[in-house]
Amino acid sequence: MKIQGKMFIWLSVFILAVAVVYGYWSKEPAGTTALFLAFGLAIMIGFYLAFTARRVDAGAQDDMEADVADEAGEVGFFSPHSWQPLSLAVGGALAFLGIAVGWWVMYFSAPILMVGLFGWVFEYYRGENRTQ
């Protein structure tokens, strides 16, 4: 976390310099305000990471001699045979198409979205994949 903290603190210094130069040259308040807010966000994240790095044990990312495998852990669980993400993607595509074409397309996309969402959530609670 020390490296990430330093990275965000240096990023905030750069954003502050850009905000000052942009504000001086452009005289435009919206962009200048956005850059100063980005500076504030970066400095808050940087100091949070720096202070948190003091309280927790050093991770593999802080060791210069570390390998990639030192930080490796369980990635997570996924089901490669599932059709539910496809139905969710089709429902989402139809929903966004409904924004462009007409809101009436949402009537067709909402049931597909619900089937995909509930099917994906409850996939391992029914049928042959039931774990309990």
Swiss-Prot record:
Main EC class of this protein? translocase
Q: What is said about its interaction partners and assembly?
A: Associates with subunits I, II and III to form cytochrome c oxidase.
Q: Which domain of life is it from?
A: Bacteria
Tell whether Transport is among the UniProt keywords: no
Q: What is its EC number?
A: 7.1.1.9
The record's GO molecular-function terms, alphabetically, read: cytochrome-c oxidase activity
Q: Which keywords belong to this entry?
A: Cell membrane, Membrane, Translocase, Transmembrane, Transmembrane helix
Q: In its UniProt record, which GO terms are filed under biological process?
A: electron transport chain
An example Pfam family from this entry, by short name, is Cyt_c_ox_IV
Reaction(s) catalysed by this chain, per the record, are: 4 Fe(II)-[cytochrome c] + O2 + 8 H(+)(in) = 4 Fe(III)-[cytochrome c] + 2 H2O + 4 H(+)(out)
Family according to the record: Belongs to the cytochrome c oxidase bacterial subunit CtaF family.
Name of this chain's protein:
Probable cytochrome c oxidase polypeptide 4
Q: Has keyword Translocase?
A: yes
One GO CC annotation: plasma membrane
**Segments crossing the lipid bilayer:** 5-25, 33-53, 88-108, 110-127
Q: Where in the cell is it found?
A: Cell membrane
